[in-house]
């Protein structure tokens, strides 16, 4: 039976309201604030100290003890170093997925259950657990599934798709049935107006409000290279480092009638291939190679293992619509995704996240995306128009 719950308290309204809801349900609640980035670093501009003060204030109002854990070294090793390595290799990483996998739902989760001896962990994520918002169904011995929340606009299952099934089995999402507006209304009702009015954090914490190109140049040395037209092979401009660009990004090259967009990056030669036009075939893909998936749904994993293929739904950006797809295993044991409709700017290093109608099934890092062949492009460009605008 679940009695004692550790809540990851960030200083924001969502985690504070989650702690309130847990206390109202009668759980013994312990708040823990995670410090993952060292603000002494001259580049990082996270609002860590202000967030800590807000977390302390919220816990005082709730009568909940607050402790701190420091994962700065572990975050640097497991998340930030990987982030830099990927950019130097021409990839575009997702540090939020890595942070959830390695820090919040691994180190922190284990600390809460094994070191502190608590029964479960709760977070302020907008997601649902099939065992219940408060793990009411944990005694059933059923596997937990990561379900889409009531507030589909705030859905954060995309960023949780890399966590382990073991961690999910002992994780509560008290906000799973709430709309964001309801959370803010409740916060005001219980005296948390200052948190309800607080601006939501967006983007990458360690970048803060800085321009990304300015930030990344502090860690990766610029290296001048060519922009090559992917059709003609002609040099149409120069860049100052492949780490400053991502697939689909507009290059803003002068002296050309049509705008150019990044189609592909080649780290070995420090070359960026660019395509003329927003929906150039080189920017559209239906076939994707991915790493072996991290499965949150054992049934889907078993279907793929038994039959060699799985019908599901796909996205690689959390704000984009889901697209039907088929995930398969090739004879060479490669995992392949075939989309029913082409998508624009599918980016190596990002994550393919798989869904059914109600749940997030798992995720896999994208290795490559094959561009549309020109002879098929005209009809498929029209098919893609509604998805890539």
Curated annotation (Swiss-Prot):
Top EC class, one word: transferase
Ligand binding (ATP): 8-15, 34, 124
Name of the protein described by the UniProt record: Mitochondrial tRNA-specific 2-thiouridylase 1
NCBIfam families: PRK00143.1, trmU
SUPFAM superfamilies for this protein: Adenine nucleotide alpha hydrolases-like
Compartment(s) where it occurs, according to its Swiss-Prot or TrEMBL record: Mitochondrion
Other remarks in the entry: During the reaction, ATP is used to activate the C2 atom of U34 by adenylation. After this, the persulfide sulfur on the catalytic cysteine is transferred to the C2 atom of the wobble base (U34) of mitochondrial tRNA(Lys), tRNA(Glu) and tRNA(Gln). The reaction probably involves hydrogen sulfide that is generated from the persulfide intermediate and that acts as a nucleophile towards the activated C2 atom on U34. Subsequently, a transient disulfide bond is formed between the two active site cysteine residues.
Superkingdom of the organism of origin: Eukaryota
Region (Interaction with tRNA): 154-156, 317-318
């Amino acid at each position: 039976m679940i009695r004692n719950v550790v809540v990851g308290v960030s200083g924001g309204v969502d985690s504070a309201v989650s702690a309130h809801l847990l206390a109202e349900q009668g759980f013994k609640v312990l708040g823990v604030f995670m410090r993952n980035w060292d603000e002494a670093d001259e580049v990082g501009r996270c609002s860590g100290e202000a967030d800590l003060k807000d977390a302390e204030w919220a816990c005082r109002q709730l009568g909940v003890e607050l402790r701190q854990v420091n994962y700065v070294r572990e975050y640097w090793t497991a998340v930030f170093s990987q982030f830099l390595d990927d950019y130097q290799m021409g990839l575009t990483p997702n540090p939020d997925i890595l942070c959830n996998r390695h820090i919040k739902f691994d180190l922190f989760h284990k600390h809460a259950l094994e070191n502190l001896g608590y029964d479960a962990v709760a977070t302020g994520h907008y997601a649902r657990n099939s065992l219940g918002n408060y793990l009411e169904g944990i005694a059933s011995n059923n596997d937990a599934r990561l379900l889409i929340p009531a507030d589909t606009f705030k859905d954060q299952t995309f960023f949780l798709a890399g966590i382990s099934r073991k961690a999910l089995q002992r994780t509560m999402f008290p906000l799973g049935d709430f709309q964001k507006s309801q959370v803010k209304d409740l916060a005001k009702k219980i005296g948390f107006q200052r948190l309800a009015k607080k601006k939501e954090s967006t983007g990458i914490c360690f970048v803060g409000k800085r321009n990304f190109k300015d930030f990344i140049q502090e860690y990766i040395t610029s290296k001048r290279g060519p922009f090559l037209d992917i059709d003609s092979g002609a040099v149409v401009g120069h860049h100052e480092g492949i780490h400053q660009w991502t697939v689909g990004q507009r290059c803003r090259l002068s002296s050309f009638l049509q705008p150019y967009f990044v189609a592909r990056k080649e780290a070995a030669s420090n070359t960026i291939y660019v395509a003329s036009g927003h929906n150039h075939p080189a920017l559209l893909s239906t076939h994707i190679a991915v790493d072996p998936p991290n499965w949150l749904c054992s049934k889907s994993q078993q279907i793929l293992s038994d039959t060699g293929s799985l019908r599901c739904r796909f996205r690689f950006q959390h704000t984009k619509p889901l697209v039907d797809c088929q995930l398969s295993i090739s004879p060479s044991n490669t995992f392949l995704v075939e989309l029913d409709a082409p998508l624009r700017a599918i980016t190596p290093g990002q994550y393919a996240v798989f869904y059914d109608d109600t749940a997030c099934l798992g995720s896999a890092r994208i290795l490559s995306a094959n561009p549309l062949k020109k002879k098929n492009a005209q009809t498929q460009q029209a098919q893609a128009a509604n998805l890539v605008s």
